[in-house]
């Protein structure tokens, strides 16, 4: 399954690379990468080192393209605006490519897809999106989880947080009834917080692609990222990193990398 996804991603890159000309130079200086410190398995900090699927993949891409990276922690709610204004050269944090976000930043070719998990404490009566009515549901502001909740469970009481850790803390204390995270993040929280009696009650797989964000018009940097991504897919690095961080992630049959 993962080989199929890797192949599809690789095929999509051919068209994207052809469209990447040169404008703003990526340069030889260190690139500042805005990322998160608490969003497993995509982007998190462990023993003082930024890691996760997205960040390790970006490191491999950078090595292939001889790019230097400096990872800096931020909040997801402000990440894209910080890329847009040039505070960060790259945004790396399982960023879903939506039409609204493309108005603010440009994206690399897709390298993964969005999968969500509805997580709840025992005894809340939450089993799926239809049972969220009147419940206090935590989401990180500005994420696909936020927009998904508004579209699919408008009668739920959305409680917005700046980052995953704050939503998890509220869920553990009972300040909210449930939360929506990336599926793998939700499963990790449930496994590592047994006393909180958390459960991923429903997984929601989408075909929304993930991409690294760059400032609009920076086609040179986007082109370097895409060239490196193509290379690490071809040499098997993509699959190894994916297997390391998301070994059980389902791959939707209808997923098409590069779909806009």
Predicted regions and their residues:
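Extended ligand-binding regions for polar small-molecule ligands
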Residues: 21, 55-64, 143, 211-249
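Extracytoplasmic small-molecule ligand-binding "clamshell" domains
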Residues: 26-94
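A ligand-binding cleft/hinge motif common to bilobed small-molecule-binding domains
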Residues: 94-103, 150-151, 177-207
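Acidic, polar ligand-binding/catalytic clefts
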Residues: 68-131
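C-terminal motif of bacterial Sec signal peptides marking the signal peptidase cleavage site
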Residues: 15-19
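Ligand-binding clefts/hinges and TM-proximal coupling segments of bilobed small-molecule sensing domains
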Residues: 22, 147-161, 198-200, 229-260
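Short helix-initiation/N-cap motifs at beta->coil->alpha
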Residues: 71-81, 124-125, 141-144, 159-169, ...
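Periplasmic-binding protein-like
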Residues: 112-120, 187, 191-227, 248-260
């Amino acid at each position: 399954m993962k080989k199929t996804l890797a192949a599809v991603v690789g095929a999509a890159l051919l068209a994207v690379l052809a469209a990447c000309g040169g404008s703003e130079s990526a340069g030889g200086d260190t690139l500042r990468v805005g990322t998160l410190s608490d969003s497993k398995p995509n982007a998190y900090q462990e023993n003082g080192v930024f890691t996760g699927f997205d960040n390790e993949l970006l490191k491999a891409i950078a090595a292939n393209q001889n790019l230097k990276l400096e990872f800096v922690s931020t909040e997801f709610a402000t990440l894209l605006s910080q890329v847009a204004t040039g505070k960060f050269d790259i945004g790396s944090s399982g960023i879903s490519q939506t039409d609204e976000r493309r108005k603010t930043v440009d994206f690399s070719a897709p390298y993964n897809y969005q999968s969500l998990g509805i997580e709840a404490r025992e005894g809340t009566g939450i089993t799926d999106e239809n049972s969220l009515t009147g419940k206090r549901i935590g989401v990180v502001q500005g994420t696909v989880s936020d927009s998904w909740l508004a579209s699919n469970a408008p009668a739920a009481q959305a409680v917005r947080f700046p980052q995953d850790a704050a939503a998890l803390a509220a869920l553990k204390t009972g300040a909210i009834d449930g939360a929506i995270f990336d599926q793998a993040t939700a499963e990790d929280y449930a496994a590592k917080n047994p006393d909180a009696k958390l459960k991923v009650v429903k997984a929601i797989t989408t075909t929304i692609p993930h991409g690294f964000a760059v400032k609009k018009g920076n086609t040179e940097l986007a082109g370097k990222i895409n060239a490196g991504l193509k290379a690490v897919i071809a040499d098997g690095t993509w699959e190894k990193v994916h297997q390391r961080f998301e070994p059980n992630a389902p791959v939707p049959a209808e997923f098409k990398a590069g779909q806009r």
